[in-house]
Amino acid sequence: LSLSAQQKEAPKFTLEGRLTKAVFYHDNGEIAQIGYFKNKKRHGNWISYYRTGKKSATGLYRSGLKTGQWFFWKENNLIEVIYKDNKIVNVLEWNNSEKKMIAVNE
């Protein structure tokens, strides 16, 4: 059974130590994102999912800014994006066993 628009699942927030864990849902009831907030800003590891339940992205926030390695899954490709203070530093893409650099921003 799927959820109708009127039965859409509301986000869930739970306190875990000094962080607030957040779970957001797609309109079909599947998890859309799981992550943490600190001082009302995204902080720590975040994971995003497609409506099918398959992982679409994972990465790290520090005080609301994307930082470090992020991975994005699209069809048969894995895209790695390196962030520093919410700015893209480097992008790599893998297609099966082939790796190629897409962009470097230094």
Predicted regions and their residues:
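Glycine/tyrosine- and acidic-biased, solvent-exposed loop/turn segments at the edges of beta-strands
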Residues: 2-106
